Amino acid sequence: MEINQAAEKEQEYVHKVYNEIAPHFSQTRYKPWPIVTQFLKTRPMGSIGIDVGCGNGKYLGVNPDIYIIGSDRSDGLIECARGINPSYNLLVADGLNLPHKNETFDFAISIAVVHHWSTRERRVEVIRHVLSKLRQGGQALIYCWALEQGSSRRGYHEGMEQDVFVPWVLPKSKSKPKTKSTPPAKVKTRPKPNLMNIPPKERSEYLQRWKEEQQRSKSLDDNDEKQQQDQEQEREEVKYRYYHLYREGELAEDCRQAGAAVHSEGFERDNWWVVAQKR
């Protein structure tokens, strides 16, 4: 896949989607994972680091004794993070083009982010780019979705396709009213009766029956129109995000390919993780 094709794929199925689902996504991301928490809490006091793909910033306040700059490609998620805590150090930035000075930080984390790049070359490159911001010996904790998720509700397992599009279902909500007004449905009407052939004594009763039938017909049409509008307005909206599902050992291979030493690795919450150390 050419670079332009890969970037277009990521724009359509990653960047665009996260901006569209940002508020709902943020509501589901609030509890830090144990190993990430442990990594952050064991950084020496006064350490400075970066969270690449910080989302709503749930890891930025885990350890008050360290300093973290959070970045994300989604300005929608950065806005969510600012809403949660205005004191967070945040910026909008692509993980392949971070604005930080090289060899500046003591550590980095990138949680459930690298798997969104759509080729191996780009995934290795983003790991290399993150490492370039660390001082020699600095460590980066990287998490990616695992292929081996047989015990989870997602059901991914060894032998399945590794490059997948994962649905995100937005809750049912009233859709915005259509900008173009649609003409109201025509009420089915019966022609007004010709009273010329009706005996004078029966005309009043005959006309009253016609009015009642006309009203019943209008009520049925109004009800049908309302049901149709409700069905159009209340619907689930599904967005699809691109993921590369990492098989066991693959993330460590990518980190080594990026020039890092693998300090430690493991599995947590359907993710493979690696602590990559800059040589």
From Swiss-Prot:
It is an enzyme of class 2 (transferase). It holds the Pfam family Methyltransf_11. GO terms for molecular function: S-adenosylmethionine-dependent methyltransferase activity; tRNA (5-carboxymethyluridine(34)-5-O)-methyltransferase activity; tRNA (uridine) methyltransferase activity; tRNA binding; tRNA methyltransferase activity. GO terms for cellular component: cytoplasm; nucleus; tRNA methyltransferase complex. It catalyses: 5-(carboxymethyl)uridine(34) in tRNA + S-adenosyl-L-methionine = 5-(2-methoxy-2-oxoethyl)uridine(34) in tRNA + S-adenosyl-L-homocysteine. Transmembrane segments: none annotated. Its EC number is 2.1.1.229. Residues 200-229 have a biased composition (Basic and acidic residues). This is tRNA (carboxymethyluridine(34)-5-O)-methyltransferase. The lineage of its organism: Eukaryota, Fungi, Dikarya, Ascomycota, Saccharomycotina.
